[in-house]
Design a protein with these regions (language model features):
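Divalent metal-coordination and catalytic microenvironments
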Residues: 17, 28, 44, 75, ...
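Alpha-helical scaffold segments that flank or form the walls of functional sites
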Residues: 27-76, 93-97, 101-102, 108-109, ...
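Active-site neighborhoods of metal-dependent hydrolases
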Residues: 79, 85-151, 189, 193-197, ...
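Histidine-centered catalytic micro-motifs
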Residues: 23-32, 145, 171-177
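Short, well-structured alpha-helical segments that form the helix of a local strand-helix-strand
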Residues: 360-369
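Histidine-rich, glycine-flanked metal-binding segment
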Residues: 1-21
Length: 369
């Protein structure tokens, strides 16, 4: 409650000279594990959700039970489109984590989850697995279609959004052409928004902080003005993070189509070294899902993103791999390297707002919505 009236409560603190703000909500976090809880709490986050990949549908109940009464923050998860495809098209069943971190294995040796167009029967099996997750309490549907652009048809995305709509749930989507150029980014969200308009269903644009972000933002704003429940999120970094074998990092896309150089844009998380095409090919043979940092846009764009109204912050935080023997008590200096957004996304928004004369209430709104 924000009010000028006299109020009372169980506890009173002296907040003179300070700002009282709600706990921050991170709707895009791929690691909801004890060894990362401290990192997120120190960044002001009190609610952590995995909405982009999510958990495997039949495993939703088990995912929640593993955390009930054990987590010092609020948590939730969407149902994973990618994992339903991995089970149906690749026979994958090695569910160690039940959610996002399992992608390190499901993407390792087989490619059906990414490249195979399902038959009608297989498509219905995929939807049935996702439906199980929605029935078990999945917040919505997470689709990483940008990693599966060859295998996922427009009809499949439409049916996903239709299924979520039956429960009043959202789809959160890594767009079909993300990362890409400004036209691809915009076309990717238009697929999702057209379905949302036709079906009247909610939709979240995952990390649209890519080339084309201005038009994506305008589309979101104009659709909300017309009453549609659609919104987007960004993280305050010019670089992203993903697996080395991501389809959009293939030379045909990253180098030839988008004009990037591996030597300038593709960095190994563990070593800090930049890849060449040759060293990438060599590492793909050894560790295809190795984490990398991807530089994709100019730093100056970050302030533009934080100025945009009606946008939420989602860290897109990554698991710390390998995570064997990591616990709540593991010293910070013993944690493996990862993208800094994992632990610093929300504090960075506050700093950039302060340094660039962006209203504090704008920053608080972005971080707590």
């Amino acid at each position: 409650v924000i009010t000028n009236k006299t109020i009372s409560g169980k506890e009173t603190i002296d907040a003179k000279g300070l700002v009282v703000a709600p706990g921050f909500i991170d709707g895009h976090q791929h690691c909801i594990e004890p060894y990362e809880y401290r990192l997120m709490l120190r960044d002001g986050r009190t609610t952590i959700l995995d909405t982009e990949i999510g958990a495997h549908g039949p495993k939703l109940n088990e995912w929640y039970k593993r955390r009930e009464g054990k987590a010092p923050l609020n948590f939730g998860v969407a149902v994973a489109h990618e994992f339903a495809r991995a089970e149906v098209l690749d026979g994958f069943k090695d569910w160690k984590y039940l959610y996002s971190p399992d992608a390190g294995q499901s993407r390792l040796t087989k490619e059906g989850w990414s490249k195979t167009r399902p038959t009608l029967e297989q498509g219905n099996q995929i939807l049935a697995l996702i439906d199980q997750g929605l029935q078990q309490g999945g917040l919505g549907i997470g689709s990483t279609v940008g990693y599966m652009r060859a295998g996922v048809s427009a009809r499949e995305i439409f049916e996903l959004q239709k299924l979520g709509g039956r429960y009043g749930r959202f789809i959160s989507m890594h767009f079909r052409y993300t990362p890409g150029d400004d036209t691809g980014e915009t076309n990717g969200i238009q697929e999702m928004l057209a379905n949302a308009a036709a079906l009247g269903t909610p939709a979240i644009a995952s990390h649209f902080n890519n080339p084309g972000y201005n038009m994506v933002h305008e589309l979101l704003v104009r659709m909300r003005e017309k009453g549609y429940n659609v919104w987007g999120e960004i993280y305050p970094y010019a670089a992203g993070s993903t697996a080395l074998n991501a389809v959009f990092l293939e030379p045909e896309v990253w180098v030839k189509a988008l004009g990037n150089k591996y030597e300038d844009t593709l960095q190994d998380v563990a070593t800090g070294e930049f890849y060449t095409q040759k060293s990438r090919e060599e590492m793909l043979k050894k560790e295809p899902t190795r984490l990398v940092i991807v530089y994709k846009i100019q730093e100056s764009a970050i302030v533009d993103w934080i100025k945009m109204p009606g946008v939420a912050i989602g860290s897109d935080g990554m698991p710390l791999i390998p995570d064997d023997n990591l616990t709540w008590d593991t010293p910070y200096e013993d944690l493996p390297n990862t993208h800094p957004r994992t632990s610093g996304a929300f504090a960075k928004v506050l700093r950039l707002a302060r340094e660039n004369n962006i209203p504090l209430m704008q920053a608080v709104s972005m971080t707590s919505y």
